[in-house]
Amino acid sequence: MANQEIFDKLTNAIATQNVAGCAQLAQEALDAGISPLDIITKGLSPGMKIIGDKFEAAEVFLPQIMMSAKAMEAAMKVLTPELEKTKVEGEEGTGLAITFVAEGDIHDIGHRLVTTMLGANGFDILDLGTDVLNETVVEEAAKHKGEKVLLVGSALMTTSMLGQKDLMDRLREENLRDSVKCMFGGAPVSSKWIDEIGADATAENAAEAAKVALNIMK
């Protein structure tokens, strides 16, 4: 099977919530000599984008999102051990990544993928999970003041994305803004929005997120 054919099948498996098929295809891709990173960026991530776009357009609903998340999780169980083999310990530019999904949002497909990629690139991880209050994020940032800290928030819905502005405001109020870097992602997040709220960066996919994170933490 050609690589592109495998990628297309992976994309379809995510978009159609095929949990068992997604895990099997991930293993087939590894067996074919495809790197875990390519499997994620060229196979799984496009499927996540499809399901995210359909959710925004109200073409699919929460049950489908949850099943796509399970399909992604099944694939990542296969891929994570391979990613761990390439993990870079103590590389300059890394630090503590505090990852979370915005308050009011429980859609963690992209969040889990980004968290995995950051860990594979040498970051220590503090995963706060989904539906996280801004107050909780600020408290954790305060606990680690003086360390190299990257806040990584994701939002699939426009409504939950708006909370990112409130988080930035709270960080400034608590005099924490200068002690952390802030990166946000998710379907509705744009570079224009990042500039508007005064954050540091965004990324279109998990692989890019890891590269951007390493760069801004140097």
From Swiss-Prot:
Organism: Methanosarcina acetivorans (strain ATCC 35395 / DSM 2834 / JCM 12185 / C2A)
GO biological process: methanogenesis
UniProt cross-references to PANTHER family, sorted A to Z: METHIONINE SYNTHASE
Coiled coil: none
A GO MF label: cobalamin binding
Keyword line: Cobalt, Metal-binding, Methanogenesis, Repeat
Protein name, per record: Monomethylamine corrinoid protein 1
Assembly and oligomerization: Can form a complex with MtmB.
Gene name per UniProt: mtmC1
Residues reported in the UniProt entry to bind methylcob(III)alamin: 107
